[in-house]
Design a protein with these regions (language model features):
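N-terminal secretory signal peptides that target proteins for export/translocation
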Residues: 1-11
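Sec-dependent N-terminal signal peptides
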Residues: 10-18
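Charge-rich, low-complexity N-terminal segments
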Residues: 30-157
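Short acidic-hydrophobic surface loop/beta-edge motif
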Residues: 33-40, 181-183, 209-211
Length: 249
């Protein structure tokens, strides 16, 4: 299963590379040379093109719809998705060759910025969504991890397999596990982390930080390997500083 998943990921990355060669000149055509520009909630953001992975998406047709390259672009257009990679911890443009090679376990940060259309100023609603009761999911008791400064709960979802998975079969599994971490400040949740489980190796391997930047009307997602979780405060802070530094005044 894991080998198949890795094969699928490699195929998807190859497909994205081909699309990138076709789309990139059109996507960046209406931006200042070497930069990608657009708006989030009226705030103009311009970032060096070297940070962009694949392509930025603008309001209009989705990137899988014919004619989407004709969407309005540039500083007067609204972003719908701004995907980037950055090295860690210096937040320089990420090495794309490493990104394509390492995939989900990329050694830097993968950042995606999207418009935020809710009135919330924090991410409490997403924590509550992750912890909602479902018939096929069970939750361990919530604990507080002092050395991280985060609450944690593990959620397990049973996967129906046919034929049933044999207990000692190392290559099949019937559970999907997520680890949810979050911080709390005065009862509100400024950031939540969704960490993915690698069943054959029985370990968490990648986390997604989700937080709101109300000052620019954006939802921010940052993906990183589990080893960086103890640095979560720096990851959130430096990502915020990076994004704010690219707002055009």
């Amino acid at each position: 299963m894991v080998l198949m998943n890795k094969f699928i990921v490699r195929c998807l990355i190859s497909l994205f590379k081909i699309m990138l060669l076709i789309i990139s000149p059109l996507t960046f055509a209406e931006n200042r040379p070497g930069f990608v520009c657009g708006k989030f909630n009226g705030h103009v953001m311009e970032v060096p093109k070297k940070y962009i992975i694949y392509w930025a998406e603008y309001e209009g047709k989705s990137s899988w719809t014919p004619g989407f390259t004709k969407n309005k672009k540039g500083c007067d257009a609204n972003f719908t998705s701004l995907p980037m990679i950055a090295s860690w911890p210096d937040m320089q443009p990420g090495d794309k060759s490493k990104w394509y090679k390492q995939g989900l376990e990329y050694e830097g940060l993968r950042i995606r910025v999207e418009p935020f259309r809710r009135s919330d100023i924090d991410i409490t609603y997403k924590r509550d969504f992750f912890l909602r009761k479902q018939n096929d999911r069970t939750f361990d008791p919530v604990i507080y991890i002092d050395n991280l400064g985060l609450f944690f709960v593990e959620a397990t979802r049973k996967i129906a397999r046919f034929p049933p998975v044999e207990k000692n079969d190392p290559y099949r599994f019937d559970e999907d596990v997520n680890g949810y971490y979050w911080a709390e400040v005065n009862g509100r949740v400024p950031v939540v982390f969704d960490c993915q489980w690698l069943p054959l190796e029985k370990r968490y391997y990648i986390c997604e930080a989700i937080f709101v930047m109300a000052e620019i009307g954006s939802l921010v997602r940052v993906f990183f390997t589990i080893e960086k979780l103890p640095q979560w405060r720096a990851i959130v802070s430096r990502t915020q500083q990076f994004l704010l530094s690219h707002i055009k005044r």
